[in-house]
């Protein structure tokens, strides 16, 4: 296997989403430790297993989307010809086999049944999102599977170091609920991207005299207007939880203020732009919604880092985490609809 194929495989594992998704479980690990020293062997095995599962889920999506990505994701290495589909299939099977073996080893070594159950559910939904016969991304359940897979990341990180989910006033359950709702909304946002690309490519059409709000969302089976309202309800609803959790003493003032000051304005601005002109502003509101989601998980990372290093170093590490995402996107998607400057 040559270097070109290895690089193509790495790109097909969508490293930018693995990178930024890792912030969720790293932050949870640090907060769950609460100043204690972890079992380094258990933690190391957990890290390798989690990264393998995350990568396998992303790779499965790249592989199963290779035909439709000629329109929706032309920088997919299975579309550009950098990666042969036969090699990709073998590697996908091998990667998931390794993930299963690692998960089994984690079970035998830690005997942490709650952790393994959470990781199994996350792995299942990560694969079921795109892999037939379920391929939930083409159903009404798509945003749910997208959201549950992401929301379980911090719970898994917590459970490797803290057996109780209600420790620290149930913080991790509360944060996972917030992340689930916003991830659900982001999942719908991604359906809008696909719908507008299909409209632009002539795969779907608006009836004469109708508007974009009346067309069906591709892969979601709801009208654009209905999906838009559901996106608003879940995305903005996530932030309604923050003052409640703050009042109940579940969230600290620092975390609450950070969540209200950074992700909330971006989410609100995205909603406003989409309502004004969903076609013209599509790339802007997609970018804002994505950045809002990223800020949520990076704030969790920052909160965790602040328990082991000074606030200044925690902020610096968060800045590196944020900068890493667009850098990796630029490498994986140098052009096309999924790039930073893509049409949608």
Tell me what each language-model feature is.
Residues 45-47, 107, 114-125, 170-180, ...:
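Hydrophobic core segments of alpha-helical transmembrane domains in multi-pass membrane proteins
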Residues 20-28, 144-161, 208-209, 286-301:
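Small-residue-rich segments of transmembrane alpha-helices in multi-pass membrane proteins
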Residues 51-60, 123-133, 151-152, 176-195, ...:
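Transmembrane alpha-helical segments that form the membrane-embedded catalytic/substrate-channel core
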Residues 70-120, 204-254, 297:
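Multi-pass membrane catalytic core of lipid/isoprenoid biosynthesis enzymes
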Residues 3-4, 254-344:
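Extended hydrophobic alpha-helices typical of membrane-associated regions
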Residues 49-80, 85-87, 181-213:
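Acidic (Asp/Glu-rich) catalytic motifs at the cytosolic membrane interface
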Residues 21-64, 99-104, 113-127, 166-189:
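Membrane-embedded alpha-helical segments that form the functional core of polytopic membrane enzymes
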Residues 2-11, 76-166:
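Intramembrane alpha-helical segments
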């Amino acid at each position: 296997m040559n270097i070109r194929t290895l690089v193509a495989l790495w790109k097909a594992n969508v490293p930018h989403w693995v990178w930024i998704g890792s912030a969720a479980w790293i932050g949870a690990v640090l907060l769950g430790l609460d100043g204690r020293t972890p079992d380094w062997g258990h933690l190391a095995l957990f890290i390798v297993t989690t990264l393998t599962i995350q990568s396998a889920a992303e790779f499965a999506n790249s592989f199963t989307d290779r035909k439709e990505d000629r329109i929706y994701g032309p920088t997919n290495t299975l579309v550009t010809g950098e990666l042969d589909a036969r090699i990709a299939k073998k590697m996908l099977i091998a990667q998931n086999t390794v993930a299963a073996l690692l998960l089994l080893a984690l079970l035998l070594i830690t005997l942490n049944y709650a952790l393994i159950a959470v990781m199994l559910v996350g792995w299942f939904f990560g694969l079921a999102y795109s892999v037939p016969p379920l391929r939930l991304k083409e159903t009404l359940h798509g945003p749910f599977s997208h959201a549950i897979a992401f929301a379980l990341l911090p719970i898994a990180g917590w459970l490797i170091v803290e057996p109780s989910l209600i420790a620290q006033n149930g913080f991790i359950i509360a944060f996972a609920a917030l992340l689930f709702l916003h991830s659900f909304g982001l999942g719908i946002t991604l359906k809008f991207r696909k719908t507008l690309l299909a409209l632009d490519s002539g795969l779907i059409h608006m009836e004469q005299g109708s508007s974009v709000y009346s067309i069906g969302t591709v892969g979601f089976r709801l009208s654009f207007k209905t999906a838009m309202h559901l996106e608003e309800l879940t995305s903005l609803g996530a932030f309604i939880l923050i003052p409640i959790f703050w009042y109940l003493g579940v969230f600290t003032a620092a975390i609450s203020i950070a969540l209200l000051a950074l992700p909330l304005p971006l989410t609100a601005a995205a909603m406003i732009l989409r309502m004004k002109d969903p076609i013209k502003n599509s790339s802007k509101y997609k970018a804002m919604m994505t950045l809002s989601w990223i800020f949520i998980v990076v704030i969790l990372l920052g909160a965790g880092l602040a328990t082991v290093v000074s606030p200044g170093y925690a902020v610096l590490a968060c800045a590196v985490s944020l900068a890493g995402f667009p850098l990796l996107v630029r490498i994986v998607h140098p052009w096309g609809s999924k790039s930073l400057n893509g049409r949608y």
